[in-house]
Regions:
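Short runs of predominantly hydrophobic/aromatic residues within well-ordered alpha helices
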Residues: 26, 46, 161-169, 173, ...
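A short, charged helix-loop
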Residues: 139-152
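Short Ser/Thr-interspersed hydrophobic loop/turn segments at strand-loop and sheet-helix junctions
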Residues: 33, 168-182
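Structural motif
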Residues: 19, 154-167
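Charged, low-complexity, helix-prone segments enriched in Lys/Glu/Asp/Gln
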Residues: 57-65, 147-150, 164-165
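ATP-dependent adenylate-handling active sites, centered on carboxylate activation for C-N bond formation
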Residues: 1-141, 182-205
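N-proximal short alpha-helices
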Residues: 2, 6, 158, 169, ...
Length: 205
């Protein structure tokens, strides 16, 4: 019941659609915390800095197995498998998406975004034609620029380090830090992120 009561207030907190369901529990935790303190510490950044997500390792294993197959062959197989209606969802659909990855960074995004990867790529080609006209009028949309353009990829020798860097440059500021700051400030709770201290980041890298 507490969670449902938060939903009508989400638009006030974020000012725009924000597709992270943990925004609700984060708000509730912040609200309880604010009853006792005015400043709190967040552990965000630890997984991205010290390779704490299992996905970093699993994607590396999958990539090492699939990269031996020529990309055109993988891409064709991905399209053929994904075209079958009965495999649009579930494990087989996920494998089809991963097969179509051109780089390990692309594969990581496909694993995290899921079916949304096709929309992300379509945005750059069609000028977001899939977005309802009402949203185009409310929010200006810059055609030809997608999340795929934010990170050049392959900057670091260790594959997992590239995935960690992707999260630090995109997922962390655009999702995690945004979510924590907005939900906490909605109850007048300030947050500090010691893991993102300059010295900690330099030590991690």
């Amino acid at each position: 019941e507490d969670a449902r009561q938060v939903i009508p207030h989400l638009a006030d907190m974020f000012g725009e659609p924000f597709a992270d369901s943990s925004q609700i529990p984060t708000y509730l935790v912040s609200k309880i915390t604010r009853e006792h303190v005015t400043v709190s510490l967040s552990g965000d950044g630890g997984d991205e800095l010290f390779c704490g997500y299992n996905t970093y390792y699993s994607i590396d294993r999958i990539w090492n197995k699939t990269k031996r197959i020529p990309f055109p062959v993988r891409k064709m197989a991905s399209v053929m498998i994904g075209a079958a209606g009965e495999v649009r969802h579930g494990g087989l659909a996920t494998r089809a998406r991963l097969l179509g990855a051109e780089t390990i960074e692309d594969m990581y995004l496909r694993s995290e975004i899921g079916e949304g990867i096709s929309l992300v790529k379509k945005q750059g080609k069609t000028g977001a034609a899939w977005i309802p006209d009402v949203w185009k009028e409310i929010l200006p949309w810059e055609a030809g620029h997608t999340i795929m353009d934010e990170y050049p990829g392959g900057l670091l020798e260790v594959p997992q380090h590239n995935l960690m860097l992707m999260d630090l440059l995109m997922y962390h500021p655009d999702d995690i830090l945004n979510k924590v700051d907005r939900t906490a400030m909605a109850v007048s709770l300030e947050t500090r992120v010691p893991m993102l201290d300059k010295d900690v980041i330099e030590f991690a890298w």
